[in-house]
A protein has these predicted regions:
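A cross-domain feature marking catalytic cores of carbohydrate-active enzymes
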Residues: 1, 25, 50-54, 82-84, ...
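Active-site mouth loops of central-metabolism enzymes
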Residues: 1-4, 53-60, 137-148
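N-terminal beta1-alpha1-beta2 module of alpha/beta enzyme domains
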Residues: 1-50, 141
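Generic recognition of short, well-ordered alpha-helical segments
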Residues: 4-8, 34, 61-65, 158, ...
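Glycine-rich "substrate-gating" loop/helix at the edge of Rossmann-like oxidoreductase active sites
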Residues: 26-27, 53-58, 96-97
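Generic structural signal for helix capping and beta-alpha/helix-loop junctions
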Residues: 30-31, 58, 87-90
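Short glycine-biased active-site loop of nucleotidyltransferases that positions the nucleotide triphosphate
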Residues: 40-41, 61, 134-135
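Internal, glycine-rich beta/alpha segment that forms the wall or movable "lid"
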Residues: 64-181
């Protein structure tokens, strides 16, 4: 969807009684956080989810800052999701994580800790030196993981509050995935 159509489409979705609206962060299209802010600002009650931002393209501290800001602006209406990202797009940017699942795990746990008010100083796949959010969310945010394979789905069941499945997922895949989460 073109960015200039987001607010109108979100309003229409709310007027038609949709229960939620989800944005993906597909590289080289429209930025998800700006689109989500436009959708939230154009609606009164419609929850909006991020399904998903890449754990590799955005540092967890920046993700936490964006998530906390949206949560404070629109309490109870923003649901963040994290995933690896499309491998081809990551390769286009020269990003090749040695352990994709470790990247998603570390990003998710760091995001949760930062949103909870912790100050992080640690070295791992992501480095932190006395990083702490200034403006914390006023409520605990549910964190979703967008995963596909069995190990990723297992990770989602371990560290996330919910799982985002592909828009292309069929009934059989959903059954298969639920057994692994």
């Amino acid at each position: 969807m073109r960015p200039e159509h987001i607010a109108r489409t979100a309003r229409q979705a709310e007027e038609l009684g949709y229960g939620e609206l989800w944005f993906s962060e597909d590289c080289f299209f429209a930025g998800a956080f700006a689109g989500i802010a436009a959708a939230l600002g154009a609606t009164e009650q419609l929850p909006v989810g991020l399904g998903v931002a890449s754990a590799v393209t955005r540092h967890p501290a920046l993700l936490a800052m964006e998530c906390a800001t949206l949560s404070r602006l629109y309490p109870g209406r923003f649901w963040p999701g994290i995933g690896l990202g499309v491998p081809f797009w990551l390769q286009q940017m020269g990003l090749k994580p040695r352990s994709p699942l470790r990247a998603v795990r570390e990003c998710t746990t760091s995001l949760r800790r930062l949103l909870g008010g912790e100050e992080l100083t640690e070295q791992g796949l992501f480095a932190f030196d006395a990083v702490q959010l200034t403006h914390l969310p006023e409520e605990e945010l549910p964190i979703y993981l967008g995963m596909v394979g069995p190990k990723g789905l297992e990770l989602a069941g371990e560290v996330a509050d919910g799982t985002v499945l592909s828009v292309l997922a069929g009934v059989e895949y959903v059954r298969w995935a639920r057994e692994r989460i």
